[in-house]
């Protein structure tokens, strides 16, 4: 896992250069948004269960996946879905704090799509639920922080699609 600082420094180091104006601007932007990201992460952490519950109610609860024969029909499958959505929210929060999506590739997306396809988990329903997480989160943390968090939730959706 990297953070925005490490990514900028590593890029300059590989090239054997000092940080240029563009690199400094990236660092300034990262530091300027730090308080916003920390506040958002605090709100998300305190409300994670509610965020996931509301997102499921908004996107999956009365869909085909929750009906008998659907992919979330048994209690065990439903619990696994909730667990996965909580996992995505947690890792997207880590990525937002770091200002870098690399943790999502390493810990979430690497092999996930293939695993879901082999298990018959409907990717479109998962993406729909993640989009609902994005909406619920934005309503709790505000527009600016919601936009920042949305970058990482969208990243997960893109990786699954």
UniProtKB/Swiss-Prot annotation:
The keyword Electron transport applies. GO terms for biological process: photosynthesis. It is a peripheral membrane protein. (2R,3E)-phycocyanobilin binds at residue 81. It is found in: Cellular thylakoid membrane. The keyword Transport applies. GO terms for cellular component: phycobilisome; plasma membrane-derived thylakoid membrane. Contains one covalently linked phycocyanobilin chromophore. InterPro entries: Allophycocyanin_b, Globin-like_sf, Phycobilisome_asu/bsu, Phycobilisome_asu/bsu_sf. Keywords: Antenna complex, Bile pigment, Chromophore, Electron transport, Membrane, Methylation, Photosynthesis, Phycobilisome, Thylakoid, Transport. The modification N4-methylasparagine is found at residue 71. Heterodimer of an alpha and a beta chain. Belongs to the phycobiliprotein family. Light-harvesting photosynthetic bile pigment-protein from the phycobiliprotein complex. Allophycocyanin has a maximum absorption at approximately 650 nanometers. This is Allophycocyanin beta chain. The gene is apcB.
């Amino acid at each position: 896992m990297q953070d925005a600082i490490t990514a900028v420094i590593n890029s300059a180091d590989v090239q054997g250069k000092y940080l240029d104006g563009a690199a400094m601007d990236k660092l300034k932007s990262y530091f300027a948004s730090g308080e916003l990201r920390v506040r958002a992460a605090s709100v998300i952490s305190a409300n994670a269960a509610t965020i996931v519950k509301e997102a499921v109610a908004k996107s999956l609860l009365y869909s085909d996946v929750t009906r008998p024969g659907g992919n979330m029909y048994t209690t065990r499958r439903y619990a696994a879905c909730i667990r996965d959505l909580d996992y995505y929210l947690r890792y997207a929060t880590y990525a937002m704090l770091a200002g870098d999506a690399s943790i999502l590739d390493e810990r979430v997306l690497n092999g996930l799509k293939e695993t879901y396809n082999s298990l018959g988990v409907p990717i479109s329903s998962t993406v729909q639920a993640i989009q609902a997480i994005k909406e619920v989160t934005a309503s709790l943390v505000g527009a600016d922080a919601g936009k920042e968090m949305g970058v990482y939730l969208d990243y997960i959706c893109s990786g699954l699609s």
